[in-house]
Amino acid sequence: MKLRVATRGSKLSIAQTMIALEAIKRVEPSLEYELVIVKTRGDIHQDKPFTAIGGKGLFEKEVNLAVLEGRADIAVHSLKDVPSAISPGLVLAMTPPRDPPYDVLVVRGGKEKTIWDLPSGAIVGTSSARRVAMLKHVRRDLVFKVLRGNVDTRLRKLEQGQYDAIVLAEAGLKRLGVDIEYWRIPPDILPPAPGQGIIGVYTLSSRSDILPILEKASDQKAMAEARAERAFLAYAGGGCHTPLGAYAELRGNTLYFHAALASPDGSRRVEVRVEGDPDKPTQVGLEAAFELRRLAAREGISL
């Protein structure tokens, strides 16, 4: 069996793709593959915020186009970069085991400091509206500055003194094997983006030749969490401008779901917690989204 695999060409994207392929090879040892590298607008315009060049879905659409046009059999994504409405004809077919979904704080000098240890006026680098608003909710005295580029570039900018601290996804550091000191930000303070830590493999819904193999290779815990979070995202709405976090966790026979929404300036925040049947992840996600929309309307926070 040979698969043509669409992916971006960054170190992190390639690392994620190899994780997915290794999971497939465990159930299909004869697997051969060819990488179809796609250069997206997000890769070209790294000096601009996501919101200025397309926002959520910036990386997803052009990679998926390779599958839709028949140039690739599957596309591999970091699921948090995939909007709730994907290209028609594609399905989420496989997820390897989930990496840590959390965000982390990296402080210049390699010291493991918490958000509470940063001095007033400290400059924190991130381009995420979710991270800015949620952290402003607990530390309104911090200054947030746009940060783009790959992980190496972001860490270099930190050490050059452009920032006092930066916020990164823990999963990215793990996948790249980056060994640095950091503080894992508790999800009660900063709930992850929906899909964070999950690698998603997409293919055409008509590919009956490879769908059974991908399903067999998929981690069922990660898939249940992914389906709950994506159902939540689809109903809750919001895009890259929306300070929205959500995280499902399957523990034992229960699927737990935590979500929060903040106003852009961080002055207001609402959150919900629900739990339900792990065999009905979509229902759990929709229940959380319905409750969050109700609370947001009551508090006057826009989605």
From Swiss-Prot:
<comment type="similarity">
    <text>Belongs to the HMBS family.</text>
</comment>
<dbReference type="GO" id="GO:0005737">
    <property type="term" value="C:cytoplasm"/>
</dbReference>
<protein>
    <recommendedName>
        <fullName>Probable porphobilinogen deaminase</fullName>
        <ecNumber>2.5.1.61</ecNumber>
    </recommendedName>
</protein>
<comment type="function">
    <text>Tetrapolymerization of the monopyrrole PBG into the hydroxymethylbilane pre-uroporphyrinogen in several discrete steps.</text>
</comment>
<dbReference type="InterPro" id="IPR022417">
    <property type="entry name" value="Porphobilin_deaminase_N"/>
</dbReference>
<dbReference type="Pfam" id="PF03900">
    <property type="entry name" value="Porphobil_deamC"/>
</dbReference>
<dbReference type="Pfam" id="PF01379">
    <property type="entry name" value="Porphobil_deam"/>
</dbReference>
<comment type="pathway">
    <text>Porphyrin-containing compound metabolism; protoporphyrin-IX biosynthesis; coproporphyrinogen-III from 5-aminolevulinate: step 2/4.</text>
</comment>
<dbReference type="GO" id="GO:0006782">
    <property type="term" value="P:protoporphyrinogen IX biosynthetic process"/>
</dbReference>
<feature type="modified residue" description="S-(dipyrrolylmethanemethyl)cysteine">
    <location>
        <position position="240"/>
    </location>
</feature>
<keyword id="KW-0627">Porphyrin biosynthesis</keyword>
<dbReference type="InterPro" id="IPR036803">
    <property type="entry name" value="Porphobilinogen_deaminase_C_sf"/>
</dbReference>
<dbReference type="InterPro" id="IPR022418">
    <property type="entry name" value="Porphobilinogen_deaminase_C"/>
</dbReference>
<dbReference type="GO" id="GO:0004418">
    <property type="term" value="F:hydroxymethylbilane synthase activity"/>
</dbReference>
<dbReference type="InterPro" id="IPR022419">
    <property type="entry name" value="Porphobilin_deaminase_cofac_BS"/>
</dbReference>
<keyword id="KW-0808">Transferase</keyword>
<dbReference type="InterPro" id="IPR000860">
    <property type="entry name" value="HemC"/>
</dbReference>
